């Protein structure tokens, strides 16, 4: 779980929105790219680090928070009297073929009253809500097929009082699909080949560790880093014919799915 220390002080109204977009490295109207949070195009988070505002990618946020940095630029004014503020940042990792972005997740603040409504679309740039009632609260989100929550920062639940500023960081990752290929060989006409003598290839999707591998009677399970239409084929082996291929040997595979292909060859 991500932890944040210190108090995030935020600006009000249009100034706040503009500052959040600027501090997170986004331009007005731009849609953050789905990705793994690394490299070119990643959305960056503003942190107050030793009195200086810096911007880092999401993978580095956790380490900075452990060392006492806080999310948000340095030196921002406090909330208005009699209110608190809660900022929700939604980060989405799509490194297994997913295409969802933060806006595809519906966020809800429970237990307290937020101006403008307690439910809103997620945003990598962050959505800041003025809180007008206080006490126990939690931040939840609607489930999105193919994605799982991987972390929620400490301020995604707890209690909030007048004058406080809190930041909730929710991170979801797309679930990799898996494909298991079982190779069966029947030798009832004098053949001596084993499953390992058959070279298997998965086509149409990207397989972590390589798309081609030796057959196995126990099954070879591979994780996919892309999804969609696929087929499983094998190299021809003299003296053997493909007797059957199960339904899982071709079709489409989606995020989080697990499919099994059984290929059976017989000596002729």
Model-based region annotation:
Residues 2-4, 52, 126:
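N-terminal secretory signal sequences
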Residues 26-29:
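Sec/Tat signal peptide C-region and signal peptidase I cleavage site
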Residues 31-77:
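Soluble extracellular-acting proteins and domains
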């Amino acid at each position: 779980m991500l932890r944040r220390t210190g108090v995030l002080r935020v600006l009000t109204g249009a100034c706040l929105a503009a500052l959040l977009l600027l501090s997170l490295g986004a331009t007005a109207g731009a849609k953050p790219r789905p990705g793994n949070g690394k490299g070119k195009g990643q959305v960056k988070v503003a942190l107050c680090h030793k009195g200086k505002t810096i911007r880092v990618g999401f993978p580095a946020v956790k380490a900075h928070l452990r060392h006492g940095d806080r999310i948000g630029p340095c030196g921002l004014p406090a909330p208005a009297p009699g209110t608190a503020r809660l900022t929700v940042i939604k980060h989405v990792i799509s490194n297994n073929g997913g295409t969802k972005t933060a806006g595809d997740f519906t966020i809800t603040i429970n237990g307290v009253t937020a101006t403008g409504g307690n439910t809103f679309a997620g945003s990598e740039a962050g959505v800041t809500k003025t809180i007008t009632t206080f006490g126990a609260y939690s931040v939840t989100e609607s489930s999105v097929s193919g994605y799982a929550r991987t972390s929620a920062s400490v301020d995604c639940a707890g209690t909030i009082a007048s004058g406080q500023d809190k930041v909730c960081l929710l991170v979801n990752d797309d679930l990799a699909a898996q494909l298991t290929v079982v190779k069966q060989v029947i030798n009832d006409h004098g053949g001596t080949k084993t499953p390992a003598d058959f070279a298997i290839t998965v086509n149409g999707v990207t397989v972590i560790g390589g798309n081609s591998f030796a057959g196995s009677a126990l099954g070879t399970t591979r994780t996919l880093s892309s999804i969609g239409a696929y087929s499983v084929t094998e190299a021809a082996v003299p003296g053997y014919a493909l007797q059957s291929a199960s339904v899982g040997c071709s079709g489409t595979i989606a995020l989080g799915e697990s499919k099994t292909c059984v290929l059976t060859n017989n000596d002729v």
